[in-house]
Amino acid sequence: TEGITLADIQETIGGLAPLPGARGFLDRLREQTQVIILSDTFEQFATPLMRQLGWPTIFCNELFTDAAGYIGSYRLRQSDGKRKAVVGLRSLGFDVTAVGDSYNDLTMIETADSGALFRPPRSIVEEYPTLPSFTEYDGLLHFLTVDTRADPAL
């Protein structure tokens, strides 16, 4: 897109607001557990929204600009990065619960110890009827914070 700098794009993104209730949801969730956002976006696009969300940890891709601020190239951290991040966290002994809303989240959700959908398109709900699906933050928060698994140490 000629004539548009990264700063121009960030200014536009900075005018967007997170979904109503998103900040409160993340704040309540972070009181009870660690949260990592895995995204296919770019750090530079995510920054304005992450600021509004209280700077949650986000793993995503990266853009590179030239001296004039125009996007020159990008770096995708790795293919299927969401799934690979879950594999890595599980290999470190973490129980991982993944939540997504689109087809590109399914390998991550299926690789996690547990997973759910949040406000997905109807087509995904119909194709994956065994995945819990939520439309409201309170239901998702309950799913994420009520541990139904028995403690293996007991």
Where are these regions (language model features)?
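C-terminal cap/substrate-recognition subdomain and adjoining C-terminal extension
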Residues: 13-14, 19-154
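N-terminal helical cap/lid subdomain that shapes the substrate entry/recognition surface
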Residues: 1-4, 8
